[in-house]
Structure formats: structure tokens, C-alpha cells
């Protein structure tokens, strides 16, 4: 089943005002739109280029009058920037990840830690944290696209849960269709990448990628999870 994002027009990106606001040139002039992705977007947009898919907000007042739903890159790839989408996609993809019938609970607290998902199957209990990925380099989806202390904390929580008999899993959900495999982003956040690869190599935290298809139609972006994909870490160097 597809996750749908509605949009009203394609605007010209002008600048990023702050973490949550971008300025665009639209049919209504220069306006400010809410941005739900607090990570970097310089790999998605450049000043003066058309390609911001915006939805008008039906409200009076406020600092923003629209929401940036997605960007079209210079290569024409649609990349979603709505931070609500990764969890919605994972909920659709969960059966292909854990296999068979699954009971899925969102925003569940386990052993004092709030998780994106708690999944119960006949093969055990899964604790899942979901990360959206919209940075792609030659088909490799890299996470994070900016240093993320929060993501490091989530890894530490998952590692602790493994000692409680829960199966910990970090799921990386593609937010653009050209991602084929996934990898921790050493160049941007060495702390996260090093911890992620250590936990993965030791079998302490499972990691999976989810590929998507994206269909752009007039007024709507449709995103579908299509397959799981590996999460790759660079080979260990001698002596490490």
C-alpha cells in the first residue's frame, strides 16, 4: 500500500531560513514553508532551481504558509523530506522485514525506552528504530546526512535491549527511489557510523534497509516500500 503526500505546486527554492523553514518562489510570490526534515538539504536543492513540491496550509497567521513535501534533484529524482513518512513506510514494510504475521505497536515504551515500533511475532519480540534516508551516493543511501547525537542514543538503547531478550533492529527507509543499498555515513558522523558497524558486526543490533518506488503524479507523490536491502559497513582494517 502506498503512502501519499499531497502537493499543490512546484516552487523555486531560494534559501533555508533555519532548521524548520525554507523560502521559495511560488505562484503566490515569495513565501516561507515549513520543513519537517531538520537534516541537511544542500544535496537536494540549490538556490534558484525549481523543484520544491509544496502544499498550502489552510490556516491563518503563523510564520509559514506552506509545507515542503519533497524535492526534485538536479537529476530529476524525487526525494521526500516529510519526517513522518519513514515510520508510515516501515509499518507497511514490516511483514517483509520480520516475516509472516506480525503484531505491530507504534510509539511503545519498553524497559524505560520509547521505541518507534514494537513487533511481536511467533519468533520473538522486535524493538525497532526507524531512520529516513534521502542522501544517495551512486545508489548507496547514507545515514545520517548531518551529525546526530539522537541516532547514537537510539543505537545505545537498542544494544541495551538486546540484553533483555528483545531483538533490536534499526531500519533505514529510503526516501528516494535510486537507493539500492545502505551504509552508515562515516564522513558526516564517525561516532554513529563506528558504533553502528561495531554493533552490526558483533550481531548485537540487526540492521535492514528498505527500498522504495516513488510515483510523481499531478498533485500527489506516492511512495511504496518494494524490497529489503543490505546495510553495508567497510571492511575492518588489519589491526582494528
UniProtKB/Swiss-Prot annotation:
Origin species: Aeropyrum pernix (strain ATCC 700893 / DSM 11879 / JCM 9820 / NBRC 100138 / K1)
Family: Belongs to the SfsA family.
Biological classification of the source: Archaea, Thermoproteota, Thermoprotei, Desulfurococcales, Desulfurococcaceae
Name the record gives this protein: Sugar fermentation stimulation protein homolog
Transmembrane feature ranges: none
HAMAP family per record: SfsA
Listed GO MF terms: DNA binding
InterPro entries documented for this protein: SfsA, SfsA_C, SfsA_N
Amino acid at each position: 500500500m502506498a503512502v501519499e503526500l499531497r502537493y499543490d505546486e512546484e516552487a523555486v527554492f531560494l534559501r533555508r531560513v533555519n532548521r524548520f523553514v525554507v523560502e521559495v518562489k511560488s505562484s503566490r510570490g515569495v513565501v516561507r514553508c515549513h520543513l519537517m526534515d531538520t537534516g541537511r538539504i544542500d544535496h537536494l536543492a540549490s538556490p534558484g532551481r525549481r523543484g520544491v513540491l509544496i502544499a498550502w496550509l489552510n490556516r491563518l497567521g503563523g510564520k509559514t504558509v506552506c509545507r515542503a513535501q519533497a524535492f526534485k534533484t538536479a537529476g530529476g529524482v524525487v526525494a521526500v523530506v516529510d519526517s513522518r513518512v519513514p515510520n508510515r513506510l516501515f509499518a507497511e514494510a514490516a511483514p517483509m522485514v520480520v516475516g509472516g504475521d506480525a503484531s505491530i505497536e507504534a510509539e511503545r515504551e519498553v524497559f524505560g525506552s520509547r521505541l518507534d515500533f514494537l513487533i511481536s511475532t511467533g519468533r520473538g519480540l522486535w524493538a525497532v528504530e526507524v531512520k529516513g534516508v534521502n542522501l544517495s551516493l551512486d545508489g548507496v543511501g547514507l545515514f545520517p546526512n548531518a551529525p546526530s547525537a539522537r541516532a547514537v542514543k537510539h543505537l545505545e538503547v537498542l544494544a541495551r535491549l538486546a540484553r533483555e531478550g528483545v531483538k533490536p533492529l534499526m531500519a533505514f527507509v529510503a526516501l528516494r527511489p535510486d537507493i539500492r543499498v545502505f551504509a552508515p555515513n562515516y564522513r558526516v558522523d564517525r561516532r554513529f557510523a563506528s558504533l553502528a558497524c561495531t554493533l552490526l558486526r558483533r550481531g548485537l543490533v540487526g540492521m535492514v534497509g528498505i527500498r522504495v518506488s516513488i510515483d510523481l503524479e499531478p498533485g500527489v507523490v506516492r511512495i511504496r516500500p518494494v524490497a529489503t536491502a543490505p546495510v553495508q559497513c567497510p571492511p575492518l582494517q588489519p589491526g582494528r
